[in-house]
Each structure stands twice: as C-alpha cells, then as structure tokens.
C-alpha cells in the first residue's frame, strides 16, 4: 500500500470533515447544536472502524487470516461468535471493539435496504454499549454518557432520514484512517484544532471559552515540564479541562507512556470534544 505524505493525509482528513459538514448543511443542520454531534460521531465511527480493522489485522492469531482476504471486513463477517470474542481478548484495552455487523462495509452494503436510518442509529448505540467500559464518560452523578447516540433523529422529516443516513455513509466510505495510526500528537492536534474551529459557535455556545490554542498549550507544557527527560509515573489532573488541549500537550511533552492523565469539565460540549481528543491521541 502506498503511504500518503503527511500533507496528503492532513488534506484528506480535513476533506472528510468538510464532506460531513456539507451533508449536514444540505439537510438544514448547518450551524445548529446538533451538527457538531453528527459530524463528530460519524468521524469517530469511521475512526473506530479503521482502528479496529488495523489492530485486528496485526493480531498474531487472527491477523494472518484477515490479511489474506482481499477485504478484511468481508472475512470478518465469516467469524463465529466465539472467534469474535477470542479476537477481542487479544486486542489492547484501548482498541474499540466492533462486531462483524458493526463494520462500515456491513452497514454500507445494507444501505440499499429500507429503514436504513434505523439500522445506522441502532448500530451506533450497540457499539456504544459494547465499548461503554472504555469510552463512556461518567458524570458527577455517576451516570454514564455513551460515546454514540442516534444521529438521524435530528432530521425532523422522517421521510428524509434514510437519505441522510446514506449520504453520511458515502461521506466516510471513501476515506481510510489506517495511514494515520502511526502519526502522533502533532498530526492529531492539528486535525482536532480544525474540527473544533468549525464548531466554535455551534449551538449558541463558544468552544473558545473552553479551548487553549495548540501553540499556547505547547509553550505552557514546555514551561511546566522543562527539559527533564527522566520523568516517570507522572499524574496530570485538570479539574477544568475544557477540550483537553493542555493535557494533550503535557502528555506529549512528558511522554504518553510515562504519565497518567485525569480530567473533568462542567460543560457537556467540551467534555464530548475532550473525549474525542483523548481517543484520537490514544489516551482514552
């Protein structure tokens, strides 16, 4: 496989975000509070799909079987329930779990059937439940907020929901995240900043209230950490983390494998973006 340059990867990822926003705009959701939820959820669903496939293909037990197939997800469809659970047991805890019926290929192939919007929403909720222990956010009241919710119900005209769901599938089907999984903080922080900027005024709120620009966060992290390259077992806690940019910069400066980060925030919007930021940087 030809590995794209960093510039091409960045441009393609930004184009994915823009295509999703184009679809939400075409269905009358541009600038609404629901737009950022739809775009970030579909962006993250595609990330989950490709991350799971990437890690599954590198598994020592099942990887060779998946790699020998022209399309890994087609081969994955043939797995028994026992084989699926066995594969899950070998994957790192940070890797999202997806059953064969959750994959993009499976969904895309079903998009021509009736009531596809219901299938898409049910699939997202099923993935959220399956991965709740790893990716759900816990509120101060100890309630869990799952990573995915229904997205097509934001379209008030029920007759247009299937069309909307199919358009979202077309947006994400042509992109592949696999080329970016070897990238680190510098790449993902730029993508996250672009994604965040697009929803700065979404739903009447301003993410700028919760956001430290990446350049400033990097300077702050360098000042806090200094040139100490021997830090180990460091704990970083931000009680008002916003979207987590400073925490990401600190983890990068210290070393992602040499620190643990903890965060919270009062804002539901910023907490959702914080979770996305953590997942993209493999720090969930």
Segments from the language model and where they lie:
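Conserved S-adenosyl-L-methionine
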Residues: 206-284
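Non-catalytic, mostly N-terminal accessory regions of nucleic-acid modification and defense proteins
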Residues: 1-224
């Amino acid at each position: 496989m030809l590995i794209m340059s960093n510039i091409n990867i960045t441009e393609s990822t930004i184009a994915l975000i823009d295509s999703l926003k184009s679809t939400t705009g075409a269905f009358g959701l541009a600038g609404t509070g629901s737009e950022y939820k739809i775009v970030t959820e579909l962006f993250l669903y595609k990330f989950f799909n490709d991350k799971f496939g990437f890690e599954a293909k590198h598994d020592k037990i099942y990887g060779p079987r998946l790699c020998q197939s022209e399309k890994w997800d087609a081969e994955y469809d043939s797995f028994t329930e026992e084989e699926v659970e066995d594969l899950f047991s070998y994957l790192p805890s940070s890797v999202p779990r997806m059953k064969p019926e959750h994959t993009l290929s499976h969904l895309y192939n079903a998009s021509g059937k009736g009531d596809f919007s219901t299938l898409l929403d049910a699939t997202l909720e099923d993935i959220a439940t399956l991965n709740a222990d790893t990716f759900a956010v816990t509120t101060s009241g100890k309630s869990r907020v799952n990573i995915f919710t229904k997205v097509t119900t934001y379209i008030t005209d029920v007759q247009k929901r299937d069309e909307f769901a199919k358009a979202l599938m077309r947006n994400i089907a042509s992109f592949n995240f696999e080329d970016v999984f070897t990238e680190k903080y510098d790449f993902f922080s730029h993508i996250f900043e672009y994604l965040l900027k697009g929803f700065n005024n979404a739903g009447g709120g301003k993410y700028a209230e919760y956001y430290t620009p990446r350049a400033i966060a990097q300077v702050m992290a360098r000042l806090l950490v200094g040139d100490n390259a021997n830090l180990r077992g460091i704990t970083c806690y931000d009680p008002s983390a916003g979207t987590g940019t400073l925490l990401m910069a600190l983890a990068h400066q210290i070393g992602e494998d040499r620190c643990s980060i903890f965060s919270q925030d009062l804002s539901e919007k910023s907490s959702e973006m914080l979770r996305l930021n953590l997942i993209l940087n493999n720090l969930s």
